[in-house]
């Protein structure tokens, strides 16, 4: 039986505008927008919440936005800056799981079902991610946590800005009943109008119709509507990038006091890593082995060695070398492999280790 999934949707709050306010503090609390010149028929890329109070929205013609708010401060698009910030945030997200699916520069899905970070709590992972983004970039993010992508995205918008919401598996059925159909993935203004003509305004209304009727009325979208109205969304989180590593890690309730204690938990980590490699199927071959240690002062170190196979002895050596760098109790220990970035793929033959 497959485990209930833990999906997080991270959505940066008015990303481009937030970067402008951070870099130019004098803009704080003033209505600002990022977009093209009105004289060149430009459009608004995004705006801050002060500007939204005037009715300004993304994709609105800049000339119209300036009519709605004469005090609007228009900032030019600095795409290189926004891309750099997005890359940093994306790198941070991959510290929690390899299963990160970017949707744009300012939002992404994470599947943390198998993550052991923050004691395996998706809620705590989302809180930590948001806190780290603010601490390191002075930008806020909102998060939604749910058993699937559709609900996670809905939840991330619930307490914006700078908030998060959890939809627990046992609460899904009750949550969707009063949910407006416009909130469903794929339901735009035209589809909302078609549903409204049938007096379908909420998911409870939609649940009254059979899948056969919805298929007849809306084609393949009918099946989707039938499932979404019941909180069903089986789409996987698909990482955009080629997988570069496979790893496992554990945050321990009691710090590991010395290198011997770290070595004592290695067999369990090794077994989990082998299982994860097996699930990955054919991969491009091993290039490096690495270990990660996070000490009780929250400083961390990573040490690696070029190897073409999984080797317990080498991992033991890396743990000892990594521990010696600080010689402090360890709160998190991880091991993993980095994969060859080649077009040839192979099945990894795992060693039969005497653990």
From Swiss-Prot:
Cofactor entry: Mg(2+)
Catalytic activity line of the entry: DNA(n) + a 2'-deoxyribonucleoside 5'-triphosphate = DNA(n+1) + diphosphate
Keywords per UniProt: Cytoplasm, DNA damage, DNA repair, DNA replication, DNA-binding, DNA-directed DNA polymerase, Magnesium, Metal-binding, Mutator protein, Nucleotidyltransferase, Transferase
Domain called UmuC: residue spans: 7-188
Binding site for Mg(2+): 11, 106
A biological process from GO: SOS response
Enzyme class: transferase
GO MF entries: damaged DNA binding; DNA-directed DNA polymerase activity; magnesium ion binding
Any one cellular-component term (Gene Ontology): cytosol
Main location per the UniProt record: cytoplasm
EC number, UniProt record: 2.7.7.7
PROSITE patterns per the UniProt record, alphabetical: UMUC
Cofactor binding comment, as recorded: Binds 2 magnesium ions per subunit.
SUPFAM superfamilies with a match to the protein in the record: DNA/RNA polymerases, Lesion bypass DNA polymerase (Y-family), little finger domain
Site positions per UniProt: Substrate discrimination: 16
Compartments it resides in: Cytoplasm
Active-site positions on this chain: 107
Function: Poorly processive, error-prone DNA polymerase involved in untargeted mutagenesis. Copies undamaged DNA at stalled replication forks, which arise in vivo from mismatched or misaligned primer ends. These misaligned primers can be extended by PolIV. Exhibits no 3'-5' exonuclease (proofreading) activity. May be involved in translesional synthesis, in conjunction with the beta clamp from PolIII.
Record family assignment: Belongs to the DNA polymerase type-Y family.
Self-association state and partner proteins as the record states: Monomer.
Full protein name: DNA polymerase IV
Protein species of origin: Legionella pneumophila (strain Paris)
Upper classification of the organism: Bacteria, Pseudomonadati, Pseudomonadota, Gammaproteobacteria, Legionellales
């Amino acid at each position: 039986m497959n485990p209930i999934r833990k999906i997080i949707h991270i959505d940066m709050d008015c990303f481009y505008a937030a970067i402008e306010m951070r870099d130019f503090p004098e803009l704080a609390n003033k209505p600002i927008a990022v977009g093209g010149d009105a004289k060149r028929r430009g459009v608004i890329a995004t705006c801050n919440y002060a500007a939204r109070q005037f009715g300004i929205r993304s994709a609105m013609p800049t000339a119209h936005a300036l009519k709605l708010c004469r005090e609007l401060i228009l900032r030019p698009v600095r795409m290189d800056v926004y891309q750099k910030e997005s890359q940093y945030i994306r790198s941070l997200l991959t510290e929690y799981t390899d299963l990160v699916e970017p949707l744009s520069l300012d939002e992404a899905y994470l599947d943390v079902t198998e993550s052991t970070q923050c004691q395996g709590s998706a809620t705590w992972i989302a809180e930590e991610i948001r806190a780290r983004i603010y601490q390191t970039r002075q930008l806020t993010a909102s998060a939604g946590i749910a058993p699937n992508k559709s609900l996670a995205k809905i939840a991330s918008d619930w307490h914006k800005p700078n908030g998060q919401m959890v939809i627990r598996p046992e609460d899904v059925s009750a949550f969707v009943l009063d949910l407006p159909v416009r909130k469903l993935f794929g339901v735009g203004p035209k589809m909302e109008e078609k549903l409204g003509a049938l007096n379908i305004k909420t998911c409870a209304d939609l649940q009254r119709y059979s899948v056969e009727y919805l298929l007849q009325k809306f084609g393949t979208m009918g099946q989707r509507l039938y499932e979404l109205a019941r909180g069903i969304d089986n789409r996987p989180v698909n990482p955009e990038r080629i997988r570069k590593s496979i790893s496992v890690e554990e945050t321990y309730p009691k710090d590991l006091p010395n290198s011997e204690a770290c070595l004592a938990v290695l067999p369990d980590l090794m077994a989990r890593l082998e299982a994860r490699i097996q699930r990955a199927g054919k991969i491009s071959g091993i290039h490096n082995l690495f270990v990660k240690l996070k000490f009780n002062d929250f400083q961390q170190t990573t040490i690696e060695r070029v190897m073409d196979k999984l080797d317990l002895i080498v991992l033991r050596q890396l743990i000892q070398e990594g521990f010696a760098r600080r010689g402090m109790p360890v709160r998190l220990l991880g091991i993993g492999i980095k994969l060859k970035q080649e077009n040839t793929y192979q099945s990894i033959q795992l060693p039969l280790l005497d653990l």
